[in-house]
């Protein structure tokens, strides 16, 4: 089980990213736009740099919904490989069966 503080930090980051996503996207669009003056682009880059680092989506890390484990994460099921194996063997995940050929 992951530390509660690490999971809480990740939840906090997700909220920050969600709250600032639109503003960040607009600033990035301005900074990359060639139709805007160089001064305007520079202001947009500075504004992006002044924003909190935790508002960037690249700071997010996928975690298991059940345990909070950051490694061995399976995107399709949003759980770690360990939880997946346990749940699959118990038949808790619909449509997942042990392979045999």
Curated annotation (Swiss-Prot):
In terms of InterPro entries, this protein maps to:
Ribosomal_uS14, Ribosomal_uS14_bac/plastid, Ribosomal_uS14_CS
Entries under Pfam families matching the protein: Ribosomal_S14
A Gene Ontology biological process term: translation
Specify the superkingdom.
Bacteria
Q: Kindly list the GO CC terms recorded for this protein.
A: cytoplasm; small ribosomal subunit
Please give one Gene Ontology molecular function term for this protein: rRNA binding
User: What are the UniProt keywords, alphabetically?
Assistant: Ribonucleoprotein, Ribosomal protein, RNA-binding, rRNA-binding
Task: State how it assembles.
Answer: Part of the 30S ribosomal subunit. Contacts proteins S3 and S10.
Q: What does this protein do?
A: Binds 16S rRNA, required for the assembly of 30S particles and may also be responsible for determining the conformation of the 16S rRNA at the A site.
What the record says about family reads: Belongs to the universal ribosomal protein uS14 family.
Question: Which HAMAP family does the entry mention?
Answer: Ribosomal_uS14_1
The protein in question is named: Small ribosomal subunit protein uS14
What organism is the protein native to?
Chlamydia trachomatis serovar D (strain ATCC VR-885 / DSM 19411 / UW-3/Cx)
**Gene that this polypeptide is encoded by:** rpsN
């Amino acid at each position: 089980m992951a530390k509660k503080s690490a999971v809480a930090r990740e939840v906090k980051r997700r909220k920050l990213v969600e709250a600032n996503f639109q503003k960040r996207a607009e600033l990035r669009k301005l900074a990359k736009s060639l139709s805007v003056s160089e001064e305007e682009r520079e202001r947009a880059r500075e504004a992006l740099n002044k924003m909190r680092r935790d508002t960037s989506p690249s700071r997010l890390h996928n975690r298991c919904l059940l345990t909070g484990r950051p490694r061995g994460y399976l995107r399709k099921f949003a759980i770690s490989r360990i939880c997946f194996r346990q749940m699959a063997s118990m038949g808790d995940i619909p449509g997942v069966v042990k392979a045999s050929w």
